[in-house]
């Protein structure tokens, strides 16, 4: 196995979904690609990828946006792991999380998928839940709105003003996770409650 990291931004393909809450993982990857000065190119594993290094002397990374719908992201992720010889413990899935308030980023290794079908499909395709997750909070749906309706809508106007800061924080979390490990990244992004 190589020391290369696979960073996967979960979302749905197509311009009609690009600004949805469900696509916040892919928005974070756009920020990381911008930092690398890279452009996404189509890979045979059914994903758009950018290969390179994050920062001077930083780790070798493959940024990937599956070209499949969110709920069937596992095939492209497993295909990229095989192609680039990347172990599951060097996979970081960046995804929306309704159980975390908007404008909050949390990190974890493994565990349950919390009803997130994209994560469930990745776990199945990798035959393990032991990969890293950067969970980008989008908040819970208001009132009795269905979760699917909520995550497949664009961010609210007030949220759009804060979104660049959230994407920046999530991209920083990905970099810190690779550079200093899970515990250091959690300590920075999971502030202690007073």
Curated annotation (Swiss-Prot):
This is Peptidyl-tRNA hydrolase. The keyword RNA-binding applies. Keywords: Cytoplasm, Hydrolase, RNA-binding, tRNA-binding. It is found in: Cytoplasm. It is an enzyme of class 3 (hydrolase). PROSITE patterns: PEPT_TRNA_HYDROL_1, PEPT_TRNA_HYDROL_2. Monomer. Its EC number is 3.1.1.29. It comes from the Bacteria. GO terms for molecular function: peptidyl-tRNA hydrolase activity; tRNA binding. GO terms for biological process: protein quality control for misfolded or incompletely synthesized proteins; rescue of stalled ribosome. Pfam families: Pept_tRNA_hydro. It comes from Paenarthrobacter aurescens (strain TC1). Hydrolyzes ribosome-free peptidyl-tRNAs (with 1 or more amino acids incorporated), which drop off the ribosome during protein synthesis, or as a result of ribosome stalling. The record marks 96 as: Stabilizes the basic form of H active site to accept a proton. The record marks 12 as: Discriminates between blocked and unblocked aminoacyl-tRNA. One of its GO terms (cellular component) is cytoplasm. It catalyses: an N-acyl-L-alpha-aminoacyl-tRNA + H2O = an N-acyl-L-amino acid + a tRNA + H(+). The active site is at residue 22.
């Amino acid at each position: 196995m190589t020391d290369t990291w696979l960073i996967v931004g979960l979302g749905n393909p197509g311009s009609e979904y690009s600004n949805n809450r469900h696509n916040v993982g892919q928005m974070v990857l756009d920020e990381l690609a911008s930092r690398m000065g890279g452009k996404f190119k189509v890979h045979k594993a059914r994903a758009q990828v950018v290969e390179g290094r994050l920062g001077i002397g930083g780790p070798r990374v493959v940024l990937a946006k599956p070209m499949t719908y969110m709920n069937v992201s596992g095939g492209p992720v497993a295909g990229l792991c095989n192609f680039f010889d990347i172990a599951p413990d060097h996979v970081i899935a960046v995804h929306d999380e309704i159980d975390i308030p908007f404008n909050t980023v949390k990190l974890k290794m493994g565990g349950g998928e919390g009803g997130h079908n994209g994560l469930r499909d990745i776990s199945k395709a990798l035959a393990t839940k032991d990969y890293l997750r950067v969970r980008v909070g989008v908040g819970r749906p208001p009132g009795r709105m269905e979760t699917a309706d909520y995550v497949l809508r664009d961010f609210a106007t007030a949220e759009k003003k804060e979104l660049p800061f959230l994407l920046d924080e999530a991209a920083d979390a990905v970099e810190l996770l690779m550079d200093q490990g899970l515990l250091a990244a959690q300590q920075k992004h999971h502030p202690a409650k007073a």
